[in-house]
Amino acid sequence: NKGGITEVSKIYDVIVLGAGPAGLAAGLYAGRSRLSVLILEKGQDGGQIAITDEIENYPGQIVEGESGPSLIARMTAQAEKFGAERVSDTITEVSLEGEVKVLKSAKAEYQARNVIIATGAHSRPIGCKGEAEFTGKGVSYCATCDANFFEDFEVYVVGGGDSAVEE
């Protein structure tokens, strides 16, 4: 323990930053390759998919009407089955110099030979009345993902960036 920071003595083969679908897949494949793996996530596992009520466009074996949290729970269990460790922590400093990479948070220091950054994306809520209440129930942040749910409905696109226009 160094100044309130716990040094994790283990040097992992791989540390994955992010426990969304990409991070969990990376952890799964690294674990299946018999590498020591640590998956670090600062928030809720799953990223944006964790707030999705129903998934219909994800490749693979999806249970009819499966929710984002359900799919992420299965993905997490699969990564852990192959040896990936999962820790909730917020990394505040990263040093990718040298053979051993160092990742620091307010409470711990982690080391790995390789780092995979899979921190994902996040939506930018606009803060209008009812937005939080109806997210996933009519308010969507991914037109490509959710367009099928809104067929034959009048929709509004809010945003001025490229993705708002393209979607």
Regions found by a protein language model. Name each.
Residues V115, T119-C142:
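Glycine-rich beta-alpha-beta "Rossmann" dinucleotide-binding loop(s) and their flanking helix/strand
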Residues T6-Y12, V16-K42, T135, Y141-E167:
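Rossmann-like dinucleotide/flavin-binding elements
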Residues A26, I49, L96, I126-C128, ...:
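Short glycine-/acidic-enriched loop or helix-start segments at secondary-structure transitions
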Residues A50-E109:
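N-terminal Rossmann-like dinucleotide/flavin-binding domain of flavoprotein oxidoreductases
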Residues Q44-G46:
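Helix N-cap at the beta1-alpha1 junction of Rossmann-like dinucleotide-binding domains, i.e.
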Residues K10-Y12, S105-N114:
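Core beta-strand elements of the Rossmann-like FAD/NAD(P) dinucleotide-binding domain
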